[in-house]
């Protein structure tokens, strides 16, 4: 929030120069990037990093595809988010600076408006092992349908099933494209009661 506050203060100073030059700006567009959290608490985020660091340092069995260190990840737990973040942005006199100049603040809240409202569902198409024994769960979707600019999407999927017994399986989720790197997630996922074709992953 601090960098946005600084930017708004600087914009207000530039607005003053524009007004002195005879212009009449009416708003500042802060753009997007309103932070949100995908995890319920910070401990989940810390636990992930501890497990990742142990893997990278050789103290734990790799849980990622080809031991990928997943160096580039979105901050899946952040604070403050949404409204509290905006309060911080507008604190320290920034809101007053905007009011004094009769400036509207435009903002692109994007996915933060729908925080917790979205879901992707995919049917399990197959469960198999590669020739080297690597377990794969194939979904009736492809990686482009949920890929981000990060190395991985760090929210564990949910298996939608009424099964309460079965053999535990750990596997990688792969998509429908017939290419080597058609991974939905780059982490091994645990299914306590197994997974079967026809199940749904959310």
Regions found by a protein language model. Give the residues of each.
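Active-site-proximal beta-alpha core segment in soluble small-molecule metabolic enzymes
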Residues: 1-29, 125-127
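Internal, charge-rich low-complexity segments
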Residues: 21-26, 35-67
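A general structural detector for well-ordered alpha-helical segments in enzyme core domains, enriched
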Residues: 7-14, 44, 51-55, 90
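Glycine-rich beta-strand-to-loop/alpha-helix junction loops that act as flexible
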Residues: 28-35, 109-111
